[in-house]
Amino acid sequence: CKKQRLAILNTFQHLIARVLDTDGLVIAQDADLSDISIDYLKQLASNEIEPWIAINQWQAKQGWDVYFYDRPNPTALIHQLELDLRAGHKCYVTTDSRSGRYGSETIDRYIKQTLKQLEDSYTKTLVVCSHTTNTTGHPAVDFVSSINTQAPAYDAVFVTPTLGTGVSIDIKHFDRVYGILQGVIPDPEVRQALARVRANVPRHLWCAKRGMGTIGSGSNNYRSLADWYQENYKENYALMSPIMRIDVDA
């Protein structure tokens, strides 16, 4: 997506303009709507438009019970996950990475091996990530396509940001939601990921104290950061000018 970003944006602009020029309808949805999204879409239109905006003001009458694990690592949370599965609870586990020490695949392997050794039983689990959902014949493909039908087949489902938005698990199957966040994705995406299961069930959450990414060039010097942002701003403007009709020299 990054490599083809300009081509994607160019195609998107032409599609929006074409639809609006032919009296078509553009329906835009955003779980974290702001003026940035609205202004961007208005700028893509070839003519001035005034969008009709519907805001969902609904709020739950009762909040979630959330258990935060204030520890250096998520081992205590993973132990609680193990106990819940041994007690027969169905668990939905959202992570922000597929591989690594606390990635979805690693935790999935650990849980299956541990429970099999302790109980000599098989816990049916599923990992949903970019790799499994793009593998022909993998159960994750069917899971994503009909999530409310497939969910009851699993004791635990481990997901990455691949399933962080765009789906709604309405069926009452999962008894617990777990979140293991190492600072890879921003907090709005974390909230979205934890809300995929709609039922008001307990949420167990571990978050890293610091994110894994860097800001700008990664420098700790404010002057270096300012210079990087200024240069990056100019480069992006130059790249975007043919698409967004920006006068770079203005």
Language-model features, listed with the residues they occupy:
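SF2 helicase catalytic motif II
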Residues: 1-28
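Conserved strand-helix element at the start of the C-terminal RecA-like helicase core
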Residues: 29, 33-37, 78-115
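Interdomain hinge/linker at the junction between the two RecA-like core domains of SF2 helicases
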Residues: 32-84
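Conserved RecA-like helicase motor-core motifs
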Residues: 48-57, 92, 115-135
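Long, low-complexity intrinsically disordered regions enriched in Ser/Thr/Pro/Gly
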Residues: 85, 123, 130-132, 145-151, ...
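Conserved helicase motor
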Residues: 96-99, 125-142, 160-163
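Conserved two-lobed SF2 helicase motor
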Residues: 151-166
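Conserved SF2 helicase motif VI
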Residues: 167, 173-204
